[in-house]
């Protein structure tokens, strides 16, 4: 199966190599942009496909050249050469996966599904390449005689352990099974994430009567009306399952049934026995991860994952959780007492439900401390928060931030771009911030990069770092984007 996929990839790649390169910006050796920032607005879906296939083809040739080198393995001709390989593939992946969660489209999702098995097979071609691993192992075993510096030792260690964890020391039958598991997991994990993105952005609680929204800040009511209009329910009010849309309902809405509807919709994403249901996918992922861990000699997938993390093993995680458990439960019980008290004042009998917690905790805070999240948020306008973070970074690390949104390529109108400058006035990084929810954007928050720091000879190449969140939007009327603690 793996050989068939690789052969198909190479054949298609060679066919593409005959095409004119000038129309694909990803194939250019250097981007004709400030600091070679990817020209986002010029890249098409077909450009990604061509660059990925060409990149895999090029890296395979580079790997084969390392394996077939007649000279004895050295740090330079094996470890450094491997580290330098795949530049086109890595550059393309940095842009594609940097945008696949923040600016996804049906076309990009289809391409991601198409490429997933090819990229998995390509990764296995390297990680389970016996000839390549033997050269890496020879350098690793003889490192005491090589006079390597600290960075070279670190790269050697990471490279060797990466091969071991990738299955290089398995026998042929286990390598084949590991490769099959990798491809299945790549497909399932991608499908899981795409399903979750779909349900987060396309699951709605719709309200017809504005009186049902009593308690919500006016700005959130306006946003609900705007969302309803955008999604074909003009004159009504809609909440999707992005946190900035549904959280205000759980925190401020007096209507208990509305809070229940939102809570249940959010917690039942991908659980509707339809094409986006993730239950069977989750079970398959768990089973395959366990099989892979056992194949690699680990008792559980947690043992395998934690080996390279600070915790090292599951027992240490449980020990930390056990230390936290008692004080956490005590604090939760105190909060629960506050919630019960506030519910009794509202004439509600019985134990609190999950959709009562945020609402009544906020009411308890108001009563006990004469303060509410809504009041605090007036001081947390998004641009003020950003400037506060930049001020802190300057005081702690001497970093300054200069906005360059209008000067640099943009992948979406909501994102901003910044130069990051050190105490000496040197540009040390490009920073892209992207803070508002939208269709095609994954839930949550993350830090990533379009390009890592590297050196091109003696010249340092600045990293392009991204910070992506889903914070509260401004109102349609141009009101402030107020955040909560």
Question: Each predicted region: which residue ranges?
Answer:
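Short His/Asp/Glu-rich catalytic/ion-coordination signatures at enzyme active sites or charged loops
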Residues: 32-47, 96-115, 138-180, 240-280, ...
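Active-site-proximal, well-structured secondary-structure segments within enzyme catalytic domains
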Residues: 155, 187, 194, 198-240, ...
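Residue-level signal for secondary-structure boundary sites
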Residues: 247, 439, 475-477
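Hydrophobic alpha-helix feature that most strongly marks membrane-spanning transmembrane helices
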Residues: 267, 472-475
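Acidic/His-rich catalytic or pseudo-catalytic neighborhoods
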Residues: 284, 465, 478
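Short pre-active-site segment immediately N-terminal to the catalytic Zn-binding motif
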Residues: 474-485
């Amino acid at each position: 199966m793996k050989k068939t996929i690789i052969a198909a990839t190479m054949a298609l790649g060679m066919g593409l190599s005959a095409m004119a390169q000038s129309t694909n910006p990803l194939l250019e050796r250097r981007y004709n942009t400030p600091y070679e920032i990817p020209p986002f607005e010029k890249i098409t879906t077909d450009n990604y496909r061509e660059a990925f296939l060409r990149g895999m083809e090029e890296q395979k040739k580079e790997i084969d050249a390392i394996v077939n080198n007649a000279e004895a393995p050295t740090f330079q001709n094996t470890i450094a050469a491997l580290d330098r390989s795949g530049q086109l593939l890595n550059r393309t992946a940095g842009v594609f996966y940097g945008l696949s969660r923040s600016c996804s489209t049906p076309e990009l999702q289809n391409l991601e599904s198409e490429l997933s098995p090819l990229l998995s097979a390509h990764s296995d071609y390297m990680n389970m390449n016996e000839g390549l691993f033997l050269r890496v192992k020879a350098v690793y075993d003889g490192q005491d005689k090589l006079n390597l510096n600290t960075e070279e030792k670190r790269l050697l260690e990471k490279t060797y352990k990466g091969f071991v964890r990738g299955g290089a020391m398995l026998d042929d039958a286990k390598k084949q099974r590991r490769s099959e598991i990798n491809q299945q997991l790549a497909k399932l994990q991608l499908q899981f994430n795409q399903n979750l993105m779909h349900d987060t952005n396309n699951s709605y609680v719709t309200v017809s009567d504005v009186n049902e929204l009593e308690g919500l800040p006016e700005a959130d009511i306006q946003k609900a009306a705007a969302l309803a209009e955008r999604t074909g329910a003009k004159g009504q009010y809609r909440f999707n399952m992005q946190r900035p849309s549904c959280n205000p309902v759980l925190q401020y809405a007096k209507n208990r049934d509305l809070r229940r509807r939102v809570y249940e919709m959010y917690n039942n994403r991908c659980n509707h026995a339809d094409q986006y249901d993730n239950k069977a996918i989750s079970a398959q992922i768990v089973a395959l991860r366990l099989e892979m861990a056992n194949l690699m000699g680990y008792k559980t997938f947690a043992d395998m994952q934690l080996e390279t993390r600070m915790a090292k093993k599951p027992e240490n995680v449980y020990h930390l959780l056990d230390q936290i458990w008692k004080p956490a439960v005590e604090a939760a019980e105190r909060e629960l007492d506050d919630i019960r008290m506030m519910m009794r004042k509202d004439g509600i009998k019985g134990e609190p439900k999950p959709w009562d917690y945020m609402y009544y905790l906020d009411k308890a805070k108001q009563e006990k401390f004469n303060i509410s999240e809504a009041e605090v948020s007036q001081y947390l306008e998004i641009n003020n928060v950003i400037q506060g973070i930049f001020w802190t970074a300057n005081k702690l690390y001497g970093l300054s931030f200069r906005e360059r949104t209008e000067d640099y390529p943009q992948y979406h109108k909501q994102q901003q771009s910044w130069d990051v400058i050190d105490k000496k006035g040197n540009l040390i990084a490009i920073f892209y911030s992207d803070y508002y929810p939208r269709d095609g954007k994954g839930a949550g928050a993350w830090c990533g990069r379009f390009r890592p720091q590297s050196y091109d000879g003696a010249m340092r190449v600045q990293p392009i770092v991204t910070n992506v969140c889903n914070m509260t939007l401004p109102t349609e009327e141009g009101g402030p984007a107020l955040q909560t603690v």
